[in-house]
Amino acid sequence: MCGTLTINDAEYTVIKLLGKGKGGYSYLVTDGTTQYVLKQIHHEPCEYYAFGDQLQAELHDYETLRKLGISMPRLLAVDTLQEHILKEYIAGQTVAELLKEGRMEPDWLKQVQTMCGLLYPAGLNIDYYPTNFIPCGGTLYYIDYECNAYMEQWDFEHWGIQYWTAQAPERTI
């Protein structure tokens, strides 16, 4: 996709598509000065996930994780009419990309375990798949805003960690 996207009448030039998730497309955009991530909510079916109001769920999850102290890109603007979210851009490769290059820092696991120490007592899990994490400046950022009710089979130790090895299998979604 080329061209522009808007949030509350502010126009952003699309640099590239960063990825597609269960709930939206994320684009790297610029206002001519700064780069951002603009997430455009989509309503495509997902066979293993039920959505209600996707935009409100995303905003609720962001606020929940922010209050817990999870390192994430800041939410900068919301356009409810267009279902667009503007986020801070965290520059760098995802953990998934780094793992494919054979790069793994033990501190990343420690930082995820620290996140788990905040999430589990609150009864929550996040999507631990490595595409959702970017190390930048010594901090591991969770770049998704999704969180779900805690279930042991989906926690980091029982599900997520299998993807955090250099030989991690591809996730099929």
Describe the residue ranges of each PLM region.
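Conserved structural core of kinase catalytic domains
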Residues: I70-W108
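Juxta-kinase regulatory segment immediately upstream of eukaryotic protein kinase catalytic domains
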Residues: M1-I15
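Hydrophobic residue at the +6 position relative to the catalytic HRD Asp in the kinase catalytic loop
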Residues: Y128-F133
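The N-lobe alphaC helix and its flanking beta3-alphaC-beta4 segment of protein kinase-like domains
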Residues: A50-L68
